[in-house]
């Protein structure tokens, strides 16, 4: 169990208020002792909100393994009936996580203002996997899975007082923050969309941090970042997990400095990604100023449709978008293959990105929730299970569509509407989740793509793809142009498959 040696110092049930200078700056219990003038032999004491009979005690003296409030699960020790609030619960990830956590006996609450539904509607598109109204989803979750979700319709930016009241009511022990606009193209449409995304994402998160400081400072924040914060440095510098490792050194002329623990450089690739970088600094500073605790989840591109919970009944399905604003690349490729649109590669298609399946992303989030950071700790994980060139992904989708489902799939290169390097080095470091949190991928790329074909080829869903097929090819250019991209080349599939298989033999992926 990855978290068995964690202590009450990590636990959100700890009550430090009035016992120590909890709002002091610093990053560790040693700093607490130093600031309070405590000698090594002195005790740092706290109380437990769940076990008041303990009175004042040393929070380092009880581990999760020893505490009766923490029970074994397949993902580590979990706090009994842990209260988790999901912000953005109506979305692709939020709804999936709510059902996933509910099935593990977490007490799930959530908020949403249905922005995602409205943004996709603005594009003229819809989720190709039909989803119900929230009231019907909540009823189905209770009826099918026995999960009761406490939901409120709240805009976290513009209805902060409502959010305050809900947090005071629920007293969440962890908050998962998915309530941001997650689209690079949406942020590049025009000045109004760019300003909206910056305001919605950055100020919404900043307001949340102040509420956590005032209401639930012992709770942990699991904040969704993005691998896109790092960009794709042409120097080939590794994409470390948010901060430089302890032994990293900066050399200049005849001098050198330690970089250990410093935030790594960011090179965002859209105004959306800029908003995520600003979030990173705001969350980092809040942990430093107020002893909040947070994990920044630098997530790769998520793909897929399956978890046991969303597959249990059509009413429990999560959304799946394929339009140019909100459709992610693998999801879009599968939809294109099904309705006969050549899979679209931007430019050369040699861009490399990190990816993770929906089910594995849920596993990762669970492991982070039940392994809270220490007070004042800002932790970062790069949440991916592998990385691939988009060209290789197109071939993988085409092969499965052709060999398993009898589809005639083509691949095309189109103009790249984005400002990005087509060919670049890419060395992501993604060690924290497996080494510190016990994560092991449970589903292969090919298996999840196969599942997607199975679902999206159902007649009703295929028809929904057909209805919105004209919204797949991009018209939003980083330059501000408003026109559909032109085709540069139709790639000969058999030659591309042969090239791909030779590459697999040499490199392994």
Positions of PLM-derived features:
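Structural element of the ATP-grasp superfamily
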Residues: 67, 208, 283, 333, ...
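Glycine/proline-rich active-site loop of Rossmann-fold NAD(P)-dependent oxidoreductases
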Residues: 277, 290-292, 304-331, 341, ...
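Short-chain dehydrogenase/reductase
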Residues: 205, 209, 283, 330, ...
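C-terminal substrate-binding subdomain of Rossmann-fold SDR/epimerase-dehydratase oxidoreductases
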Residues: 103, 147, 337-509
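Cysteine-centered metal-binding/redox modules
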Residues: 1-73
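N-terminal Rossmann-like NAD(P)+-binding domain of SDR-like oxidoreductases, especially those catalyzing
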Residues: 73-306, 503-509
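Hydrophobic alpha-helix immediately C-terminal to the catalytic Tyr-X-X-X-Lys motif of short-chain
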Residues: 278-286, 333, 393, 397
């Amino acid at each position: 169990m990855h978290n068995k040696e964690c202590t009450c110092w990590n636990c959100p049930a700890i009550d430090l208020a009035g016992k120590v200078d909890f709002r002091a700056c610093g990053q560790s219990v040693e700093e607490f002792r130093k600031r309070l003038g405590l000698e090594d032999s002195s005790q740092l004491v706290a109380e437990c909100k769940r076990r008041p009979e303990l009175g004042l005690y040393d929070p380092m003296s009880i581990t999760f393994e020893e505490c009766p409030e923490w029970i074994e699960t397949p993902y580590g020790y979990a706090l009994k009936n842990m209260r988790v609030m999901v912000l953005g619960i109506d979305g692709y990830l939020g709804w999936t996580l709510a059902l996933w956590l509910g099935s593990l006996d977490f007490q799930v609450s959530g908020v949403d203002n249905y922005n995602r539904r409205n943004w996709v509607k603005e594009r003229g598109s819809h989720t190709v996997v039909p989803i119900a109204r929230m009231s019907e989803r909540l009823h189905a979750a209770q009826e099918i899975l026995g999960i009761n979700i406490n939901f409120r319709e709240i805009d976290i930016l513009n209805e902060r007082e409502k959010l305050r009241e809900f947090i005071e009511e629920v007293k969440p022990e962890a908050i998962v923050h998915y309530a941001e606009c997650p689209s690079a193209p949406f942020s590049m449409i025009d000045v109004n969309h760019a300003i909206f995304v910056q305001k919605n994402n950055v100020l919404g998160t900043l307001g949340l941090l102040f509420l956590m400081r005032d209401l639930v400072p012992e709770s942990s924040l699991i904040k969704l970042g993005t691998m896109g914060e790092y960009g794709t440095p042409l120097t080939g510098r590794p994409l470390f997990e948010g901060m430089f490792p302890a032994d990293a050194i900066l050399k200049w002329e005849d001098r050198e400095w330690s970089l250990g623990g410093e935030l790594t450089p960011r090179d965002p690739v859209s105004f959306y990604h800029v908003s995520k970088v600003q979030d990173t600094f705001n969350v980092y500073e809040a942990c430093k100023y107020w002893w909040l605790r947070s994990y920044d989840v630098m997530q790769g591109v998520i793909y897929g449709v399956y978890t046991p919970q969303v597959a249990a009944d059509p009413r429990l399905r999560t959304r799946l978008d394929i339009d140019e604003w909100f459709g992610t690349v693998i999801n879009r490729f599968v939809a294109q293959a099904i309705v006969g649109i050549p899979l679209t590669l931007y430019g050369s298609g040699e861009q490399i990105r990190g990816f993770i399946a929906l089910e594995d992303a849920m596993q990762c989030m669970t492991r982070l929730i039940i392994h809270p950071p220490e007070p004042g700790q800002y932790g970062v994980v790069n949440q991916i299970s592998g990385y691939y060139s988009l060209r290789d992904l197109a071939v993988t989708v085409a092969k499965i569509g052709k060999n398993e489902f009898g589809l005639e799939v083509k691949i095309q290169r189109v103009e790249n509407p984005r400002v990005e390097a087509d060919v670049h080095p890419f060395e992501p470091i993604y060690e924290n989740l497996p080494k510190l949190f016990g994560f092991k991928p449970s589903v292969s790329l090919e298996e999840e793509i196969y599942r997607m074909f199975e679902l999206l080829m159902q007649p009703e869903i295929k028809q929904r793809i057909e209805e919105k097929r004209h919204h797949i090819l991009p018209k939003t250019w980083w330059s501000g142009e408003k026109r559909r991209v032109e085709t540069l080349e139709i790639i000969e599939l058999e030659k591309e498959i042969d090239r791909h298989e030779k590459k697999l033999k040499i490199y392994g992926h």
